[in-house]
């Protein structure tokens, strides 16, 4: 089985948003035929990073593309402006960054992770992404993570918060019900 919980234990954790060692420039997020730039600008607080480098740019992109109307975009802008109240003050962890079930290859020997959007982020983000699109063995994965490095109190209440960025990306790239899902999740926190 995958050693999911220990993947980030002991990492250098320079700042939220920082890329992997020796990486220069932005990263990428999304499908290889339509990758979106992924800012790797470092921030010392998760809330500042998530607001400035994830929520604000994707909200603007969705607004410009007509995916979100003015009221919906204003809701996400308000959330970005007040997101610090949801900050848990945890140190950054090295995360996969695009950890949905399609980027986990399960074999009899365990799991292999592919197609990362690696950076230092909030460690709850990868688990939230796995939950978003239905990952096999999710309960076992979370239990293994909890055994190695227990999650902060209230982490389950923050799952949808960490799902906002990938939901909005899906709304921008694929349309469908992702815009409504994004706005529904944002209303829980704004």
PLM segments and residue spans:
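A cross-family kinase active-site recognition segment
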Residues: 1-67, 91-92
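Conserved NTP-binding catalytic cores of kinases and kinase-like/nucleotidyltransferase enzymes
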Residues: 4-10, 107-111, 190
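Regulatory N- and C-terminal appendages and interdomain linkers associated
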Residues: 11, 74, 169-172, 177-190
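Active-site Asp-x-Gly
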Residues: 46-48, 60, 89-94, 101-157, ...
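Short, conserved active-site entrance elements at the starts or edges of catalytic domains
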Residues: 68-87
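Hydrophobic alpha-helical segments that form the core
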Residues: 160-168
């Amino acid at each position: 089985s995958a050693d999911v919980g220990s993947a980030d234990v002991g990492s250098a954790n320079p700042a939220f948003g920082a890329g992997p060692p020796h990486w220069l420039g932005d990263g990428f997020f999304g499908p290889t035929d339509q990758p979106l730039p992924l800012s790797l600008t470092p921030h010392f607080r998760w809330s500042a990073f998530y607001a400035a480098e994830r929520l604000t740019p994707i909200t603007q992109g969705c607004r410009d593309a007509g995916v979100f109307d003015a009221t919906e975009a204003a809701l996400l802008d308000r959330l970005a402006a007040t997101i610090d109240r949801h900050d848990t003050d945890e140190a950054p962890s090295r995360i996969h960054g695009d950890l949905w079930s399609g980027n986990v290859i399960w074999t009899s020997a365990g799991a292999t992770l592919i197609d990362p959007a690696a950076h230092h982020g909030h460690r709850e983000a990868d688990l939230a992404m796995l939950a978003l699109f239905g990952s096999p063995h999710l309960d076992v994965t979370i239990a293994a993570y909890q055994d190695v490095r227990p999650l902060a109190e209230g982490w389950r209440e923050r799952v949808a918060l960490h799902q906002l960025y990938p939901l909005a990306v899906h709304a921008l790239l694929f349309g469908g019900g992702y815009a409504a899902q994004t706005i529904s999740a944002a209303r829980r926190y704004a």
